[in-house]
Amino acid sequence: MANMIYTAMPALPKKHHTNAVVLPSEWNTCPLSSIVEEISETVGTRKIETISISAGIGFVNQAEKFGRELSGKQYEKYIVLHKGDFSYNKGNSNIYPQGCIYRLNNRTEAAVPNVFESFRVSVGNPDYYEQLFLSGFLNRQLYSKINRGVRDNGLLNLKGKDFYSCEVPYPPLAEQERIAEILIQCDHVIELKEQKLDELKQLKKEFLRKMFPAKGCDTPEIRFPGFTGAWEQRKLIDEVTSIDTGKSKFTPQKSGVYEILGSTSVIGYDDSYDYEGDFLLTARVGANAGELYRHSGKVKISDNTVFIKGEQLDFIYYALLHFDIKRLSFGTGQPLVKASELKTQDIMMPVDSDERSAISTYFSNLVHLITLHQRELEETKTYKKTLAKLLLTGIVRVQG
């Protein structure tokens, strides 16, 4: 039986070990320096847009990022990139601890700091190597070459010669082109899904504005058919059970029977609870003060969390999103939202409970649709990431 199985199995492709990764035997490897040309062209006296690299985003206008334009000797030493050129930002970040490499795709030319390693691919398919860099292929090698620690300017201790000594795969050119084509198609699909998600989020924002009365008005701009008449102004505290600040005492555990609610989400677990019901919650102090989230059940609530408890909170939730309780935050330091302020807050409500239900149902369905699109987008990104790893290292081969 074993012989039959082995006979039926196709021969495994031959592999060879490199300093970078295990690759198909017909793929070559080479130092980055052998396929790229370092860029040394400086700005000098020319006026060229200055850009920087933002981890996870790519190239961004430097004035927009830092709030100022550069001039003088420092600017003159900036490196000129042309469309299709690459830059490696040696600044470390949480998502890119070994720095990140991006390609200039949406500008004809631009100037980048001369502390970046800037280069263009002169041998091989630039699209293939863009995908290789985006996949983080160099990270393991960079980690081994970086002198531990970060310099005073926030850059990693990595010399240019060490960066360019990193080994990269060099598949047959036709295969490079086919791999790049497949992964670029994935990027296009991701871009379309991101656009659709942005459109849905913008739709939600617009309808929150139009389906609730504007300040000083008692009817919304848009209503469902069959509903007329003015909305009423009511005290928020009169429409809910209670508004308060969490007072639970606890030592968070990684597991337990009951959830502990913090300023933005669940922060741990405990074996006892202090509160039970349906809640709207927000941070009491800090950058998240005024950002609402929902939760139901038996819970503990931290002292940095303001909560609203009640029944049928759907309409209240969307009414408060329209109102934007961040406007209630105050203080010269960090933003602060007080339960006492919320208790005195007025909100506009339809007299007809059916209209409240119709509005709540509409937004609940829209939020559900946004969640589905968000999940689909993340799944597509994961699929592309996995596919890139398989294709870029030859684990899965494609016809050139």
Task: Give each language-model segment a name.
Residues 12-15, 109-115, 148-174, 300-303, ...:
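A short glycine-rich beta-alpha junction/loop motif
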Residues 12-43, 173, 223-246, 251, ...:
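Non-catalytic DNA-recognition/assembly elements of restriction-modification systems
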Residues 13, 48-52, 62-72:
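Short, structured beta-strand/loop micro-motifs enriched in basic residues and often containing a Trp
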Residues 28, 70, 76-83:
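Residue-level recognition of short, solvent-exposed, well-ordered loop/turn junctions
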Residues 53-67, 109-110, 252:
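Short, basic/aromatic beta-hairpin or loop at an interaction surface
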